[in-house]
């Protein structure tokens, strides 16, 4: 097998992690079919629910107590609105991976074999390199005897859930029973049909190798020297800034200045037209701005130029912020983080 210059360069910062990778034989232990969910921790669930339903017309796919799960496209992918606890800052607080033939007991063994530890009894969520198995009962939308769920924190402390590809946040052994879907109370001014990607600011150089080890992620595109790590066989990806390892673009110099965690999430839509989408957002009440500030309820476009893998004249990347100032990017459903006007040109590397 030939090794491209890009593949070799991207592997250099991860060399300290290689002994563990060599110890693993065969394919990665988990096969993810793609991104499955994003969780927003919000100051007011009712306000955020009204905002997102008014914008996208998303039905309620499931409820987990006071947490609301909004269906993305045809489902079972979802956007979760979780109420912030007292003193908790609103954030994009978690992501999810759909995993083929998912089994919690096997997954826990895999994590234990890689040095992860169970979170302390009574913990609300795991710390970095920990996991937690939560049993969700009927009062939180699970089964009467409990729906078991697995949450993991990567080396930088970023939280993600792994679950079966059929998971919808409902009841049943796999959390895949969502029979009480509620139609949106508002029509929506546009529609999103799929997940796209997450951009994560990390502070531990083992972060990217951690995901490569578990899922076998490989670059599907580069923005300058920063890889878009493909998730599944489609166009979903993760991108890391800060000191994540696995990329010469992430030396760690800027990690301390930015907040560690998920910077923004991206959703895909059909027939993306940045000018039309911007106008719909403005008509919906958002303020168009030239800069990339994160005040609540603004929208802006950033042009990714050829030096960062974009098109001649720039690949338009559109962002908006919600009532809590959380940033969501909108792109065409074919967007892969690559070149072309739609960012959908990702030739094999």
Residue ranges and their predicted role:
Residues 2-18, 22-28, 33-44, 68-71, 84-191, 199, ...:
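Vicinal oxygen chelate
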Residues 87-93, 172, 247-252, 339-341:
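Short, surface-exposed linear segments at secondary-structure transitions and domain or protein termini
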Residues 75-80, 89, 157-160, 169, ...:
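Short, charged/polar, Gly/Pro-enriched secondary-structure boundary elements
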Residues 53, 57, 100, 112-116, ...:
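Sec-exported extracytoplasmic/periplasmic mature domains
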Residues 30, 39-78, 198-246:
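Core segments of cupin and vicinal oxygen chelate
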Residues 24-28, 82-85, 184-187, 249-255:
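Short beta-strand/turn micro-motifs at beta-sheet edges
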């Amino acid at each position: 097998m030939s090794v491209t210059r890009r593949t070799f360069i991207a592997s250099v910062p991860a060399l300290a992690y290689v002994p563990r990778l060599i110890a693993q034989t065969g394919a990665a232990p988990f096969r993810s079919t793609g991104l499955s969910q994003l969780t927003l921790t919000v100051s007011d669930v009712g306000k955020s629910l009204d905002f997102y339903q008014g914008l996208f017309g998303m039905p309620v796919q499931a409820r987990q107590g006071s947490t609301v799960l909004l269906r993305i496209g045809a489902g079972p992918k979802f956007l979760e609105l979780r109420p912030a606890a007292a003193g908790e800052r609103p954030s994009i607080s978690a992501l999810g991976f759909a995993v083929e033939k998912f089994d919690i007991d096997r997954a826990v063994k895999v994590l234990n074999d890689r040095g992860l530890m169970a979170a302390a009894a009574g913990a609300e969520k795991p710390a970095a390199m920990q996991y937690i198995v939560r049993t969700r009962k009927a009062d939180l939308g699970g089964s009467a005897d409990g729906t078991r769920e697995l949450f993991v924190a990567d080396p930088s402390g970023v939280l993600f859930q792994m679950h079966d590809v059929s998971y919808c946040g409902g009841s049943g052994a796999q959390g895949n029973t969502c029979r009480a879907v509620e139609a949106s109370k508002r029509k929506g001014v546009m529609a999103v049909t799929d997940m796209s990607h997450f951009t994560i600011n990390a502070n531990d150089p083992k972060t990217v190798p951690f995901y490569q080890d578990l899922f076998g992620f490989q670059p599907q595109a580069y923005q300058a020297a920063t890889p878009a790590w493909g998730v599944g066989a489609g166009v979903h990806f993760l991108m890391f800034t800060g000191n994540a390892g696995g990329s010469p673009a992430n030396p760690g110099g800027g990690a301390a200045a930015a907040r560690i965690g998920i910077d923004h999430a991206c959703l895909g839509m059909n027939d993306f037209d940045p000018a039309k989408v911007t106008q719909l957002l403005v008509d919906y009440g958002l303020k168009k701005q030239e800069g990339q500030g994160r005040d609540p309820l603004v929208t802006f476009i950033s042009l990714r130029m050829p030096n960062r893998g974009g098109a001649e004249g720039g690949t338009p990347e559109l962002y908006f912020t919600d009532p809590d100032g959380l940033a969501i990017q909108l792109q065409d459903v074919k967007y892969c983080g690559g070149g072309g006007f739609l960012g959908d040109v990702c030739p094999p590397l």
